[in-house]
Swiss-Prot record:
GO terms for biological process: N-acetylneuraminate catabolic process. The gene is nanK. This is N-acetylmannosamine kinase. HAMAP family: ManNAc_kinase (MF_01234). InterPro entries: ATPase_NBD, ManNAc_kinase_bac, ROK, ROK_cs. ATP binds at residues 5-12, 132-139. Zn(2+) binds at H156, C166, C168, C173. Keywords: ATP-binding, Carbohydrate metabolism, Kinase, Metal-binding, Nucleotide-binding, Transferase, Zinc. Pathway: Amino-sugar metabolism; N-acetylneuraminate degradation; D-fructose 6-phosphate from N-acetylneuraminate: step 2/5. It catalyses: an N-acyl-D-mannosamine + ATP = an N-acyl-D-mannosamine 6-phosphate + ADP + H(+). Its EC number is 2.7.1.60. It comes from Escherichia coli O127:H6 (strain E2348/69 / EPEC). It is an enzyme of class 2 (transferase). Belongs to the ROK (NagC/XylR) family. NanK subfamily.
Length: 291
């Protein structure tokens, strides 16, 4: 059975056909609409899936935000242009006439990355560092989503009580500091207004402020990982996302994690499926996992 998998992120929308063998075909991308209206997202999703839906038997969505009862509830609305609520499952069922499931994108990615690991590993945490910071937890070989879908939203744990206000309403969240949006928001002077990609480029060219911003992000993530180890005693942490997979970033995180007491050390791995982990995880869950 072929699954039409969709990944909804703060920067881009992706879709692909994924067979029972896990092979990705006909991958497509569109930018996430900047508009705050549900109609803009519906129109973008329609354009994304219309060339693919005739070749699929079901739809599986991995989306940023809390997924509850098939709807997207934005914990940080800034990541989706201010969109607070969107009926994901209902919308895709109307667009495709196919049975549809939905799950948080980082939770989906955690499940895909877990499947790629050795069989003796039962406990992992996946962290995506991209437009925002998200996570997914696999404990005892089971994906933990929580009764309200909030499990794994580790980007909204406290990093600095005197830090910037996060879009979720809290102050000093990991996401407000370590994410691509957080890196860009802290830029000043010549870098003011630059996005995270530009800041990484400037860091590679030796720009001191750009390097400091990236170190700040990596240090914040390392402290989060130490907290995660203390909370879950996971066997490894897998890091993905456009920032998490940027050249040299994971090595920086490892350097800062090594400065923590040894009890809080844990193996760090780059995401095996790179930017396709959410798509694959959603498809895998559609094949047999009850959500």
């Amino acid at each position: 059975m072929t699954t039409l998998a969709i990944d909804i992120g703060g920067t881009k929308l992706a879709a692909a056909l994924i067979g029972a063998d896990g092979q990705i075909r006909d991958r497509r991308e569109l930018p996430t609409p900047a508009s705050q209206t549900p109609q803009a997202l519906r129109d973008a999703l329609s354009a994304l899936v219309s060339p693919l839906q005739a070749h699929a038997q079901r739809v599986a969505i991995a989306s940023t935000g809390i997924i509850r009862d098939g709807s997207l509830l934005a914990l940080n609305p800034h990541n989706l242009g201010g969109l607070l609520h969107f009926p994901l499952v209902k919308t895709l069922e109307q667009l495709t006439n196919l049975p549809t499931i939905a799950i948080n994108d980082a939770q989906a990615a955690a499940w895909a990355e877990y499947q790629a690991l050795d069989g003796d590993i039962t406990d992992i945490v996946f962290i995506t560092v991209s437009t925002g910071v998200g996570g997914g937890v696999v404990s005892g070989g089971k994906l933990r989503t929580g009764p309200g879908g909030l499990a794994g939203h580790i980007g909204h744990t406290l990093a600095d009580p005197h830090g910037p206000v996060c879009g979720c309403g809290r102050t000093g969240c990991v996401e407000a500091i370590a994410s691509g949006r957080g890196i860009a928001a802290a830029a000043q002077g010549e870098l003011a207004g630059a996005n995270a990609k530009t800041i990484f480029t400037r860091a590679g060219q030796g720009d001191e402020q750009a390097q400091q911003l990236i170190h700040r992000s990596a240090r914040t993530l390392a402290r989060l990982i130490a907290d995660i180890k203390a909370t879950t005693d996971c066997q490894c942490v897998v890091v993905g996302g456009s920032v998490g997979l940027a050249e040299g970033y994971l090595a920086l995180v490892e350097t800062y994690l090594a400065q923590e007491p040894e009890a809080f050390h844990v193996d760090l791995l780059a995401a095996h499926y790179r930017h396709d982990a959410g798509l694959l995880g959603a498809a895998l869950l559609a094949q047999g996992e009850k959500l």
